[in-house]
Amino acid sequence: MSAQSMSGYFFMPNHIILVGASERPYSLGERILSNLLSAPFQGQITPVNLRHRTVAGLTSYTNLNKIPGSADLVIAVTPPDSYDALFKSCRKKQFGHIILIQDWESLSDDEWQTAEAAIKKHHGDELNISVCSPAGVQLPSQSLNISSQPDHPAGYTALLTGHASVSSEINLMLQKMGQGISRHISLNYPLSPTTSADWLNRFGHNRHTKVAVIEHNPAENQRNLFSAIRHFTRHTTLST
């Protein structure tokens, strides 16, 4: 089965690799690893760090090629100049899914171009690439927080945005209404080849989701997006 065809795959990970995991306070790698460990996610977490044999008490590896066995999902918080080699390693190891998380607004135009070139080169049937804001991915029902944000309370609203700030605002509104999150992802719309339509299709019909809130993505194919919306609203209420 190709990486592209595995609907819902991200929502049942048993083994997650975090490339760029760190203990350095306030770094992106430290914040995301801390949230993964404190949620707490019940599956296996494997850190990748160039300098340390252990990170947060977990056995760490210097690169993907040294990790034994398979993994469901790779998370990378390393800079764009690492992407080309990282994607090659993912394909060699047959790790079919990777999510890139960065504070994109702090990066230079050259770094954006480096990221864009590597993503365009490697995204395809062998490797599915999603590009996220620091708000990343949260699945409260599975105690999974792959983001720099605090844990969202569990509830029945699926949230898909293109900005970390929008995710925070909607989450605060939901909390004031006494509501929580079933699934959340915050994409980098300009860079992510895996679109909001793709993710909406992956949301599928899920007992944990009664309504979905989506921030419109004008950068993607609108026909595909509205087709995904039509299919989704056959079983679940949606708001944009």
Please place each PLM-identified region on the residue numbering.
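Catalytic-core regions of core metabolic enzymes
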Residues: M1-T240
